[in-house]
């Protein structure tokens, strides 16, 4: 058998990167012929295509230069939780002052090749990961006249192309309120079980930014078309729901092969901007006998004219888990110079788990949120929220 060894060496400022890719099982060099024993590895076939980006790159028209950016949010607030009867609050007191943080450091860079194609990288470091994933997202970006390709750990087209009402304080959508308002007090009157905070984040009980099986930043391949007359389409594929995992997924042990799509419209007509979005995702390969049949849908609509903005979004999730349910978000906002104010509403329904032997609460939540912001300077904003 013949073989190929590809060695790419890229150097810059004392940093060396060495990448080797081997194919087949026999390699020749100029000094000797190495005979290798043929080994049959089951009936394994490998077909792979990839791209490697490094900073700096000696083969690029311009070297990739990574820039450092990101954001930091520091909040100080007070919460009063009602200890009403029958709410399962025994031994729990979540009222009082607290400080909460949300910060990320972003490493981004790109270069344009001689053929006009742009290749970039995006790595996001969580400064407040709360015991979770240290690297939030890490993916490769390829852009050209054909559109854009993302490869790596990142949200899907269904998530990123979704439109929801703009807010100027603590987000009522996508679960930011979870950190302040405890959901362990919300109890199903029928079976006495609590509604976990997991129902807020990336599930329609508290968010319209959703994906099937809450795939979030799992490894994905996503393609976005060019925007034509305001319309853009995005398609995503994820082998499974794991993030930062290079192990081959076991399709007999977990639901795999997720597909997600997003379609949106964004265009201005004079002084009026119109935005609309549709998204859908499902699981193609489910564990036999699971009966999960997970699917997710979301939609959004927004109008902006002058400093006034209006928006509404909806999401529904259908499967046998505790994430099953729907959510509706509506809001209005107004901005003038450095000032901005927003009023938002969210209604969430949670149908509870239908999996045999699993007890999970049903419930509803309604939240109103009034927020204001003031830009103190470039990149510095003071904000406040009452909910």
Task: Tell where the protein language model's regions lie, with residue ranges.
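Transmembrane beta-strands of outer-membrane beta-barrel proteins
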Residues: 66-74, 115, 119-123, 149, ...
